[in-house]
Amino acid sequence: MNSLQQLSIADTLTTIRPGKIADRPFWNRFARQFIYCPAFEFSKVNGAASYRFHVCDRFGTDHTFTADSPDAPLTPIWAELPVGPVFVVVDAMDASGNTIARVGERTFYRNAPFNACYPPKSCSYADCARKTYEYLFQLDFIQELSKGIVDPDYPLSCYPSKMLSSIINGMVNYAEMNPERKADAMRIARGAADNLIKTAIPAGEPLEFFPLTYSGKVIKSAGGEKTIMMLYPASVGRAMLKLFAASGERHYLDYAIKIGEQYLKLQLPNGTWHLILNQADGLPNAANYCCPTGIMLFLEALAEACGDIRYRTVAKRGVSFFSDLIDSFNWEGQFEDVAAQKTPYQNLSKHIATDIYLYLGKIQPDAPEVRRGAREVQRFSEDPFIVWEQPGWAGSPDAFNERTEESLHTRNWGWLRWHTPCALEQYRCYVPVDASVAKMIRYFLLMYDLEKNPLDLAKARALGDSFTRVQCSNGRIPTWMSPESPLSDDWINCMFASAEALKLLAKYEEQ
């Protein structure tokens, strides 16, 4: 076992944010797989002197230990458990060691920890990023934007703010990378931006000037087709500022200011914004709040671009909302095509957790509480969302499902088709997504910058290496981390995110 493997195994004995400490809830009540040692929400039984844990692995071996509390972590046996399905039974015992009650049961998947021995990359990270940009540039949907046309045949054109803002950013980046194609790339960026401005909510309406979250034949929506998810106007605003900086064309800054003014009016006393607003009346469609990181970054950039400190003042108020999210650990998935979470912890994702510490890690890198929180979020983000390797057991997923329908491997769990290492998106889309891999590359690099722990850099590289191996010969990085998936299933915004993560990782290639 090499030094990185030793670091990895030792780290997996850490229990992430256990519940019932300082009244914290158990965040993992809906989690279905673990790399790090878990503890579960089992309640005490009157008259119990101790609690006996029976932990059955995929081979049928019963690992047992006794604890004073039914929610004790599985630390005594965690290192012994092989990768595969695990079935936990906890019994309450009296002072004589007799069973007096069944406390609870739990099924989960013991996921493989990072082992530092994966296949090498097939090309440099910089080359992989370049090929991805070349592939994206020639796509029909992107080329049509140079004529001001949004091709409705691309199914995901129904999410204009998300798709077109990513294309603006991507084409400005590509123009910088490839001067020979700068004019063409900038023409595409302008076409995407002009379309967003042209189709924005008209003046005089409650949400005037906001770009549309949904348009055309909508596949799925979080709150209805005539709603605005408040994350996305900020994404568009940041793209407009990037285009203004690259082109000098004032009307893109002017439109970003219009978006910024709406955020100033709509900020709530708690420092954030409602997640979803009805387009017709501007009222909240759901009780959920935004994680405000993206909005704050937009407002800070807007203040820098136009010199108006009001935007920076409003952005600073968002920091106060971070503490609520950090304390609750309710890192809900916030996506335009998934209904807003109604039950806490039911649909977790690593995105808003990592976004917060990517932000705090830049502005307060030496703060001990930021470093502690960032490490805790790294473990959380890896625990239920990274798959370092395919399961190596000979069991049947169908047999595993027979044990409980709430187990990890549902009928949709297609592990034999997954190209690993990979990262899963959210509980409600519990499959590999390249943008999730990209986010974790960026996050592991943040952790490496903060602490210089070689394990973080090794994990970032392992994920980047996976990109180089899954990339198709034409430069495509499949959204679902499977070259067999149809081209029409690719999310362009995700591929741009992957290319940018690879460009960042290339800066660490020789370290």
Q: Each PLM stretch: what is its role?
A:
Residues A95-P113:
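Extracellular fibronectin type III
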Residues T64-A72:
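Short beta-strand segments within Ig-like beta-sandwich modules, predominantly Fibronectin type-III
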Residues A112-Q511:
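Glycan-recognition and catalytic cores of secretory/periplasmic carbohydrate-active enzymes
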Residues K44-F59:
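Solvent-exposed loop/turn segments flanking beta-strands in beta-repeat/beta-sandwich domains
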Residues I77-P85:
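Surface-exposed, short loops/turns at beta-strand junctions within beta-sandwich domains
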Residues N2-N46, R106-A112:
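Pro/Thr/Ser/Gly-rich low-complexity, intrinsically disordered linker/stalk tracts
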